Amino acid sequence: MANVYDAMKKSQAQQAARRPPGQPEGEAWAGAAAAGPTQLYRPPLGRCARNVVIPYDPAGRIAEEYRALRDNLCCQFREKKFCLLVTSAEPREGKTVTCLNLAFALAEDRDRRTVVVDCNLRRPQVAALLRTAAAPGVADVLRRAATLADVTWNTMAPNLFAIPAGRAVAYEVGDLLRSPVLDDVVADLRHQFDYVLVDSPPIRVAPDVGFLGRAATQALLVVRLRKTRRPSVSRAIALLHAANIKPLGLALTCR
């Protein structure tokens, strides 16, 4: 009996080692598929925030709206691969929540790998919503203090990954995003992943989106219904064009 018990414990340990981090024992996310190759496996740090709705209510109306957004975006790309900037005109428009829900919707394609990159180095939100560590992250890679493998985290979905912003002080953000290292980072991400979503600062608040035009030449503009005024949206679109970033469309959010 002792040998059987030891064998069972060994089998359970092997299964746990293969289980994607972020997925509790005996629990599967509705959109989950078999895990593909990843950079690192890390212990789970807890479930993501409830306003990232797809893992919690995959059959709900809001989840379906994010899938419709996903399908509309994918129709605009001949190849099923893209690198997309997700931004907003003003703060508090639901930009990061939209970015993460879109990422979970994309991750329902079991044959594709998706990564969310938090490039809002001034006010990052991705790590807080996904309950992952805030650092190291993008800032550390741009300083050459870490590699992409060091900062890439698993999520509740086996083929969805996240890279937090890391820690940066305001005066160095421009220099970090201006660094040629950013070009290498983007090239590596495009090679490793099918869908790259870059969460950026609000375009009318911070000047960083201009630098991020090197990372993604197309953008989704998030607009809060009955809050964001039309002149603000028009100005945001003009700023995207000035940075050589093509707006692919608007995503309307509401409370």
Q: What feature does the model see in each segment?
A:
Residues 80-84:
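Pre-Walker A (Motif I) flank of P-loop NTPase domains
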